[in-house]
Amino acid sequence: LLALLLVACGFQLRGSQPLPFSSLYIATGEGSELGAALRRNIRALGSTQLPATPQEAQAIFTVIGEAREKSILSLSGAGRVREFQLRYRFAYRVHDLKGREFVPPTEIVLVRDISFSDEQVLAKEYEEGLLYRDMQNDMVQQVMRRLAAAKIEG
């Protein structure tokens, strides 16, 4: 019944939106996991080409910075670490060779908290890796949504 009501009112899940660029050069370092994930997502859309050089592209995606940070969030009464805060920062811009900005310099910061135990060091290191991978996937999805919302004039 609920599904029928949702369909009747015109509700539909948000699908992947095509990017406004006919071609986009992704300027990331060699071996960048985030760059590879962005390329995979853009190829999956099928509407935007990924040329080998910036001269062939309508727009250029430039990474300004990418960093993983880890800081102590809380200590036990004995002075041992109980929680860490993980941060994943990513800054980028989208422009063309003439200097026009399609997406101005933008920084996205994702934060996750992780508990810590001296007795489970290996398990917590593995969990930390999973959290960073999860943050990277979230980052790719946020960047894709922001790219889809970019405005191109003329």
Regions picked out by a protein language model, each given a short descriptive name:
Residues 47-59:
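Short acidic low-complexity segments
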Residues 42, 46, 67, 94, ...:
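Sec/Tat-exported extracytoplasmic proteins
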Residues 62-107, 114-129:
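Surface-exposed short loop/turn segments
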Residues 1-7:
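Sec-dependent bacterial lipoprotein signal peptides
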Residues 7-47, 152-154:
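A structural "domain/chain start" motif
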Residues 122-154:
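C-terminal/domain-edge helix-coil "capping" segments
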Residues 29-36, 81, 85, 125-138:
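Soluble non-cytosolic domains of exported or imported proteins
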